[in-house]
Amino acid sequence: MIQNKDCLDFLSELEDDTVDLVVTDPPYFQIVKNEWDNQWSSEEEYLEWCAKWTTECVRVLKPNRCLYVWGTTKTDTFLRYKLDVLNKQPEMVYQSWIIWSYDWGGRTKKNFARKHEDLLMYSKGKDYLFKSDEIRIPYIMKKSVRKGVELNALGKIPTDVWPKNNHTTSKEYCGWHPTQKPVELLERIIKAHTNEGDVVVDIFSGSGSTAVAAKKTNRIFKGCEQDKTYWEKSVLRL
């Protein structure tokens, strides 16, 4: 279920400790040309707003469950969000900084091509659910180079660098949103930190990629998107 409403209004309707996983991709602050990324007069105002929805996400998240926040380091704003907002949430523990790497798009002749986006993982408490066997990937080598070591038949656990070149598993929906994320990577997050029937929340659901991933993995999705055009697209996808 995706609602066409403001994220704080949506979160206010959720009870404490009722969500199993939060995965969200907030506005970056003056990175994308769209109006939704340029609605704050200053970085300070933007971070104050981030603190409000982050606090609400922590409130609704169950203990020992995870919060994932997508971002970009094209500017220092995402770093300040980590240091001045997430790190100041007393219940939350930093766990990982994941990189989504890709190889499409233009190049500059003046610097190395920047081809990645960032993903912060925090848990509510030191312990958290992590179902490693659900997200294993094939080994590159067929046999271990170490003597007496057998490779896991299910594959290896991914590193914190996730290469993935296409935005979605369906070309039909590629490009529906300027900051769209690959459904396959969202499925990985969901499988790692939830069980079937658990509740997954995305408060900036865009064109609905997280909702699609939740549906494909038999989870309950709850989310919102304030932009009516993107909300309508997400409804079509589902």
State the predicted function of each range.
Residues 235-238:
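Short, conserved SAM-binding/catalytic segment
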